[in-house]
């Protein structure tokens, strides 16, 4: 079965979402019975028994949603905190699924200091209800537990908005309200430390392979390079560079004879999240787009799919795939949503990690892209 990794369409009164997050059809039917089996300082464990009550073998998604107390920060009604996909379950058979959820997965961020812990991820005190099921609406209560105020991670302000605006949040009673965001206290460059300068030594005869073989350090290798060589090292050539595989997106690295003489190869990349784009007549496999992969909620399947893509990259002498796409579906009109996985950051992150892992298994890699601010 496949499930929506986005929510879509309101009813005529625009009060009820017709297709909630996690909604999907199957050729069979399932029952899910769940319970919280352990709560520790940093994680909770939920066990679910999934039974196939239909006539056809199939897989099912078990998603864990958390309803947190509104507290002073305001929370979504429910937030996805973890998920798993069963193996194929025969009719009448069942499978036990155990999901361990780090508490950080449903912590809230306090950017104003209203809790007394500014710039931290934390859990506000109160009762936390845990639900298990496929979609966010039909998921059944697995249990609840009482949580004391707990700071999960203390951070520092780095890049807060420069201008204040109002954002929608909830009061303690759940009422939707608009409140101004806190004013910036530090600029984005205030805390950036300048790196130590490496003294230029000139050509010492070192090759990049000497770093790999631990004969020299990377700093010693870099010290050989002039400013002009360093600039060229980070300069890229666009589509169809003659220095790499024909028809690919860009080349970078060893683009000059001097850099190649140091053992720095010209590195090749190509688009993208829907498979290799080769604008030269070379044929390649087209992949399901990011959103369709997200709808599977199947990390194992995503990893295996990208293992295959990794082999295809190597066959075409491409070093890095320009993907997966990491932007989330903030706006349904975003022109490149097909490249992105979900409106949910957890699904997006886990699916993208599975894809990168699949590429890496066969010695390829990917470039996670459009992490934010690419709403075209």
Predicted feature residues:
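Glycoside hydrolase catalytic-domain context in secreted enzymes
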Residues: 1-138, 155-376
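Extracellular and select intracellular beta-sandwich modules with Ser/Thr-enriched
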Residues: 139-143
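Short beta-strand edge segments in extracellular beta-sheet folds
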Residues: 144-154
